[in-house]
Amino acid sequence: MFKQFFSSSLKTLHVIPSKPFTRRLHNLFLRDRLKRLHHEDHNHQHHHDPMDPKLVKPGISNVNEHFVHDETFIKSYNKLIEGNKAFVKEKTNIHPDYFKELCKSQHPTYFFISCSDSRVPPNELTKTDPGEIFVHRNVANQVKRSDLNCQSALFYAVEALKVSHIIVLGHTHCGGIAAAAKNQSLGVVDLWLQNVRDIAVSNRAELGLIKNEHDFLDKLTELNIKHQALNVCKSAVVQKAWAEGRKLRVSGWMCDIETGYIKDLDVAQKDWEEIKKFFQFSFTQEKH
């Protein structure tokens, strides 16, 4: 590798090294490297190397000594690895070529924009397999024009994957919604949740009638899901798909964590019809 690196580097300078020259460079490099390794070993002889084979337990790599000797961490870590093995075994027992087929391509029907909350994983909630849904997740399931991550995923889902259904998935007991409802500074999170606060202000008359905090947060969650689903409708890539005659549906779902059940809020496209004249793009090219 060293020889190849030097040869390619010198070629860019229009110098073709001879074999003896390259060999000398190689030897000089190795000599210098050995000196530095010896120096480092001398300076750190009293420190434990976290990657020492004597310290590292099977199945764990790239962790420091503290975690290597933390039995709770080891059990938790190994649970993930064993869970993966069980998952693979379950799939291949039914269909031996499951993953060979899966790696060829993906053709998901659905694109989920979901909250990052660990209690609402879209695949598990809908009992879908790998390859069935394309997923983007963030705190409080936001769909912002300024969020290149979300907008890129949306564009890819519609234009490349040709999904037929986009679902914004929110949930009860959302920490992001609760944080947005409080008059308390949360640092950088304030910037992310400002949109939720704006939704609360825009609907203050309706929300002001609710006296119970639980009901207030549930209503704000619904309003947020509705707003984000409409933001999906406002996107150019979705409107372009509709202009081309594609049957692309947009929905807003709310998961009740207390029961596990999902409720279709039936809001997105119905409300879009009422406001589309203000946000609809034109995709016809003007004739000059």
Question: What is each PLM-predicted segment?
Answer:
Residues F2-F5, S9, L13-P108, A140-S152, ...:
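Divalent-metal-activated hydrolytic enzyme cores
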Residues E90-E132:
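N-terminal short beta-loop-beta anion/metal-coordinating cradle
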Residues I113-C115, R137, I167-H171, S251-D256:
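Short beta-strand segments
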Residues D117-R119, H171-G176:
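Gly/Ser/Thr-rich loops at beta-strand to alpha-helix junctions
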Residues D129-N141:
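Glycine/charged-rich beta-loop-alpha catalytic/anionic-binding loops adjacent to active sites
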